[in-house]
Amino acid sequence: MSVLLVGVSHRTAPVPVLERVAVTDTDRPKLTDKLLASSHISEAMIVSTCNRVEIYAVVDAFHGALAEVGELLADHSGLDLTDLHRHAYVRYSEAAAEHLFAVASGLDSMVIGEQQILGQIRTAYASSDAQQAAGRTLHELAQQALRVGKRVHSETGIDSAGASVVSVALDRAAGIVGAGGLTGRTAVVVGAGSMGGLSVAHLTRAGIGRIVVVNRTRERAEHLADTARSNGVAAEALELAELPDAMAQADVLVTCTGAVGAVVTLADTHRALAQPGRDSERPLVICDLGLPRDVEPAVSGLPGVTVLDMESLQRDPAAGAAASDADAARTIVAAELANYLAGQRLAEVTPTVTALRQRAADVVEAELMRLDSRLPGLDDPERDEVARTVRRVVDKLLHAPTVRVKQLASAPGGDSYAAALRELFELSPGSVEAVAKPTELGGADLGAIDITDGFIAGQDPRLRRFVADDNRGKESQA
């Protein structure tokens, strides 16, 4: 069983495509169930953020699982497979682990070094675990990815600038609202999730004068408003129906709800701008960080309104971390990946070693029983000494090869040594819980498959280009 990754991100797709493939909190359990119902998938985890959707699946057949994931993603998004393949990327086995480690470290983010992705991976993992969709393989992969991300952020300066999509959007908003930036102004935050919390924190640090938190439930909005008040900022909590009134007071509005359909409509915005007492020359900057987008497209055409959405941020991304910090992060990722893969290979050979030792123990017991029948006159002390001697001999004979096979198996290509051990000692498949190679690959190395031009021979033409070529693979992890 190996891990297959199929994803779409800001590096490979425009925002309209990302909107189509976006997986909301409501969608995630349903799509996970569909993945688990597939014939080649035993575990599944879906990472969904404002600029990426990635499906991690533990599969027993590469080609079959790739077809199933592709078709499910196409069905979910409403995109044709031929459209989807132009924007999707595929990673398999070791490459899938490497990609997740890089993502968790903030190396693949639109703003290099941002920390929010760690929480988003944690959410994806928790959701998968809650649905019992994560088995041993995904548990180990996700937990290791979170550890790698934490290590990168604690041992490098990759996040020293404190940049995130929220901070980049609000920094740009500060330059639009006029002299003094955000200091003393009024901001409306729509949504009380993680992005809302991050927005409140950044606005507080920026010296905002007042924050209005708007949410479907007032209770969650009140919690964020309390956070702002505890930091000395005047704050108010409102329900979503009161959004137009809140907008009438705003200089900046930040929204990221994950809702399907517009939350900030043209009619509501027009009504807010027309409220008595609002200066017609007063600009309103709306930061739409939702995916799908929360703001109706026509809103950007209103006089005095500037909409900063993921598409505009994607066109002009922030610099993020310094090159030296990013290089240090990549070094950590490479080292942690090597350790993780060595551990995975060792885990695969351990059942073989256990089965070999059990086979030896069975042989010893059988021979001792034969000895009892041939020399019935042996007293107990003599028999015990013979048994101890035979077991010591067997242990000494097995010690060197079992230690050595573990060492060899932890290196790339080491699974062949475990296979040789099983062949030499005729260990039956039933006695060894070895991880099987994907059946459709017939145990072959992926390197033997021609993917240099993005195709896998023999596949449905609509699916072939899901497999990324070498250059694209490098770009996605740059």
Curated annotation (Swiss-Prot):
Alphabetic keyword roster: NADP, Oxidoreductase, Porphyrin biosynthesis
InterPro entries: 4pyrrol_synth_GluRdtase, 4pyrrol_synth_GluRdtase_dimer, 4pyrrol_synth_GluRdtase_N, GluRdtase_CS, GluRdtase_dimer_dom_sf, GluRdtase_N_sf, NAD(P)-bd_dom_sf, Shikm_DH/Glu-tRNA_Rdtase
GO process annotations (BP): protoporphyrinogen IX biosynthetic process from glutamate
Active site (UniProt): 50 (nucleophile)
UniProt site (Important for activity): 99
Catalytic activity: (S)-4-amino-5-oxopentanoate + tRNA(Glu) + NADP(+) = L-glutamyl-tRNA(Glu) + NADPH + H(+)
Class of the enzyme per the UniProt entry, highest EC level: oxidoreductase
Pfam family, one: GlutR_N
Keyword Oxidoreductase in annotation: yes
Family recorded in the similarity comment: Belongs to the glutamyl-tRNA reductase family.
Written domain comment of the UniProt record: Possesses an unusual extended V-shaped dimeric structure with each monomer consisting of three distinct domains arranged along a curved 'spinal' alpha-helix. The N-terminal catalytic domain specifically recognizes the glutamate moiety of the substrate. The second domain is the NADPH-binding domain, and the third C-terminal domain is responsible for dimerization.
Stated role: Catalyzes the NADPH-dependent reduction of glutamyl-tRNA(Glu) to glutamate 1-semialdehyde (GSA).
Protein name as catalogued: Glutamyl-tRNA reductase
Organism: Rhodococcus opacus (strain B4)
Gene: hemA
